[in-house]
């Protein structure tokens, strides 16, 4: 995936926040994945249909981080979610 891509969240995937953690669960396979608050914000923006580049721009305004580090984090999280079947390229 690259930063111009958007992410699709399958209909069988649900997310719930418990305390400071957001848990993503695939109801069909039982696969789950935990997100910290920054990862949860990325997930929220992915669900809004934004490109990964737009998500990066939004998060740069919200967190003190370099663009390079954030782009790497976004691409890494997206790839982990894709590998687990919790998200796919749109």
What spans do the regions from the language model cover?
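Acidic, low-complexity/disordered tracts enriched in E/D and polar residues
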Residues: 1-40, 44, 90
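Long, charge-rich, low-complexity alpha-helical segments
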Residues: 31-90
């Amino acid at each position: 995936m690259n930063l111009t891509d958007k992410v699709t969240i399958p209909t069988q995937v649900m997310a719930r926040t418990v305390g400071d953690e957001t848990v993503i669960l695939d109801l069909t396979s039982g696969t789950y994945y935990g997100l910290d608050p920054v990862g949860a914000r990325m997930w929220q923006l992915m669900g809004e249909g934004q490109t990964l580049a737009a998500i990066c721009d939004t998060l740069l305004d919200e967190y003190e981080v370099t663009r390079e580090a954030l782009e790497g984090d976004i691409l890494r999280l997206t790839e982990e979610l894709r590998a687990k079947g919790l998200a796919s390229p749109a």
